[in-house]
Amino acid sequence: MSGNKSPFPDGRIPDRLPDGRPAVPWRSRWTEGVLPLWLVATAGGMAVLFVVGLFFYGSYTGVGSA
């Protein structure tokens, strides 16, 4: 995230500022971090589609086919 030091000993960032605004902008929540969440979700979705496709392929060509 940003280079600001957290006031908490374990490095947490408070969810809200004293005036009620979010402590971290929404844009930063989706684009900062070790890996962006959208990238992880895209890779996971592609993996699920691949596995489901593999099952359908196997059902037509493998032991389960008539």
Curated annotation (Swiss-Prot):
Subcellular location as annotated: Cellular thylakoid membrane
Q: Identify the Pfam families for this entry.
A: PsbJ
Report the leader peptide range. Answer: none
Instruction: Set out the biological process GO terms recorded for this chain's protein.
Output: photosynthesis
**One GO cellular component term noted in the UniProt record for this chain:** plasma membrane-derived thylakoid membrane
> How is this protein positioned relative to the membrane?
Single-pass membrane protein
Q: Domain of life of the organism in this record? A: Bacteria
Task: Return the InterPro entries for the record.
Answer: PSII_PsbJ (IPR002682), PSII_PsbJ_sf (IPR037267)
- Major location category of this protein: membrane
> What parts of the sequence cross the membrane?
37-57
Q: Where is the segment annotated Disordered?
A: 1-23
Record keywords: Membrane, Photosynthesis, Photosystem II, Reaction center, Thylakoid, Transmembrane, Transmembrane helix
Member of which family? Belongs to the PsbJ family.
Provide the function of this protein. Answer: One of the components of the core complex of photosystem II (PSII). PSII is a light-driven water:plastoquinone oxidoreductase that uses light energy to abstract electrons from H(2)O, generating O(2) and a proton gradient subsequently used for ATP formation. It consists of a core antenna complex that captures photons, and an electron transfer chain that converts photonic excitation into a charge separation.
- Quaternary data: PSII is composed of 1 copy each of membrane proteins PsbA, PsbB, PsbC, PsbD, PsbE, PsbF, PsbH, PsbI, PsbJ, PsbK, PsbL, PsbM, PsbT, PsbX, PsbY, PsbZ, Psb30/Ycf12, peripheral proteins PsbO, CyanoQ (PsbQ), PsbU, PsbV and a large number of cofactors. It forms dimeric complexes.
What is the protein name stated in its UniProt record?
A: Photosystem II reaction center protein J
The source organism is Parasynechococcus marenigrum (strain WH8102)
Q: What is the lineage of its organism?
A: Bacteria, Bacillati, Cyanobacteriota, Cyanophyceae, Synechococcales
